[in-house]
Amino acid sequence: SRGLGDVYKRQAIAYAISSKNKHTPIRPVQTYQPASNFDSEENVERKVKAVDEMFNKEEFLSWTRSLFVKLQEAWTARDWSTIRVFETNELFEQHQKQLQGYIDRKQINVMERICVLSVKLADFKQTGNKDVLTVVLKSRMNDYIIDETTGKIVKGDKTTDRYSTYKLDFIRTTGEKTKPGSIEINTTNCPNCGAPTQITSSGKCEYCGSVITTGEHSWALSNLEKIG
């Protein structure tokens, strides 16, 4: 089945305008990036700490694990608004559109038994006014599609585990530093006005109207690509 990981990366996703079904997606071409193309985790950590001495590798990778699981759960729940704060505008809109395709077809892509097997730093660079931190994550999960009305499986099965490797790119504004408590999986306060807020699909604080994404203040997911 076409799990969440198979629809990541803007450059790798396309839609076929079919005469039979205008929502028919083309399975993206997987781009396999050899491990040799990545930097060593020690070098990556050193590069990040050179510009952000408070960066904590263990905390960041733990947050990445939690976020990855949260992504899969939100995909199954078909409620991408809970992810708004953690993604860039472009990536959020891409994923929201893809998820809407399942909703329109009255299908649910179920992701179950999600297990993050490993996660490590793979690259760090500064481009333009952005810091870009790359992570490689390996996972195991069950992935199948059901009809929302009947509950009948239309693709995949409940017993087969899928092993996959992903490349996650996180960005933030260059010059931002790690602050205690700045990386949280449950963001409930607007970083601009401090008010407790619900994250809407537009990503705006309901009190001050500011667009809320973690990329302005901390790391935000800009790309997640299946590489193996």
Task: For the regions a language model picked out, list residue spans one by one.
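Transmembrane-cytosolic junction motif
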Residues: 13-33
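Extended alpha-helical interaction scaffolds used for oligomerization/partner binding
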Residues: 140, 152, 161-167
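Mixed-charge, low-complexity intrinsically disordered segments
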Residues: 147-159
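Short, small-residue-biased leader/transition segments that mark boundaries at the very start
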Residues: 2-8
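Short flexible coil/turn linkers enriched for glycine and charged/polar residues
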Residues: 126-131, 162, 184, 199
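Cys/His-clustered metal-coordination modules, chiefly Zn-binding fingers
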Residues: 168-228
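Core segments of small alpha/beta cavity-forming domains
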Residues: 32-113, 192, 206-207, 211, ...
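Surface-exposed, charged secondary-structure patches
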Residues: 106-149
